[in-house]
Amino acid sequence: MRVLGIETSCDETGIAVYDDDKGLLSHTLYSQVKLHADYGGVVPELASRDHVRKIVPLIRQALADADMTIEDIDGIAYTKGPGLIGALLVGACVGRALAFSWDKPAIGVHHMEGHLLAPMLEDDVPEFPFLALLVSGGHSMLVGVEGIGRYEVLGESVDDAAGEAFDKTAKLMGLDYPGGPRLSKLAAKGVANSYRFPRPMTDKPGLNFSFSGLKTFAANTIAAEPNDEQTRANIACAFEEAVVDTLAIKCKRALKQTGYQRLVIAGGVSANTRLRAQLAEMMTNLGGKVFYPRGEFCTDNGAMIAYAGLQRLKAGQTDDLGVKGQPRWPLDTLEPVD
């Protein structure tokens, strides 16, 4: 089965073709980073309009790269939510139109399920069950995964997501958008333990996260300290250490609670070098193993949507002809794939 995947949940237009037997045949991606840089963040209306401009040329490119036409495609998967409603509707409209015009089955995919399953695009794939740490600009959650669609949200952020905290702290430091990766680059020049930031909610039972207070602590530290490059690097390093330590502590707690031996990390923040290294060391010490997608599949992309959609289309799941987007969509409400 060959599936065309369409991702338009935020500020990346991602298109891919995935074959059940041959794997990923093609994927194309257009990032709107330059478009939104002057505004310091994503402007929803501009994002939607740019998806409209880019989506059809990217679909043509992905099909050409796979040496296919739409007639060679067996199904279509598009991101249904969560995300920006205008951006979601662009992908949903195009996906549904192609499905209707060419009489193909189509399915709306949960964006975070796409991230959760992104490591399945690699050669070394995790077996079920496993613990998933999903960390991005909009989400931070720990999920117990027994199978596709069999998810239990064990913990999540009660305020800012980890990626959001990275971006907001970077903005406080005067770093250009997108701030998260720039903050991490600056942190690499910092001296470890120069500052001691709190590890939020790690002294309390439970698996939820809270990063808004950490952002406030960073703001106060930035305001109180000199503005030279080394001090800024030290503050960035301390902030990153605090976020990574917090995520690692919660992961270890969740692994103990569930008894799982495999950990998946996915989402934009999963590309963070310090996070990957610390969780890999932790899993080695625990006798387990960590899995994550390659860097290009940590951020939003069409490949993960094509893969996730294929699993559901193979199981006979499809959506009706309605064009729908779900800006909010709890992950644990998804239908299992038997």
From Swiss-Prot:
Protein name, please?
tRNA N6-adenosine threonylcarbamoyltransferase
The protein's location, in the record's own words, is: Cytoplasm
What S-S linkages are listed for this chain? none
An example Gene Ontology CC term for this record: cytoplasm
Q: Which family does it belong to?
A: Belongs to the KAE1 / TsaD family.
Tell me the GO molecular function terms.
iron ion binding; N(6)-L-threonylcarbamoyladenine synthase activity
This protein's encoding gene: tsaD
- Which keywords annotate this record? Acyltransferase, Cytoplasm, Iron, Metal-binding, Transferase, tRNA processing
How is its cofactor bound, per UniProt?
Answer: Binds 1 Fe(2+) ion per subunit.
As for what it does, the entry says:
Required for the formation of a threonylcarbamoyl group on adenosine at position 37 (t(6)A37) in tRNAs that read codons beginning with adenine. Is involved in the transfer of the threonylcarbamoyl moiety of threonylcarbamoyl-AMP (TC-AMP) to the N6 group of A37, together with TsaE and TsaB. TsaD likely plays a direct catalytic role in this reaction.
Lineage start? Bacteria, Pseudomonadati, Pseudomonadota, Gammaproteobacteria, Alteromonadales
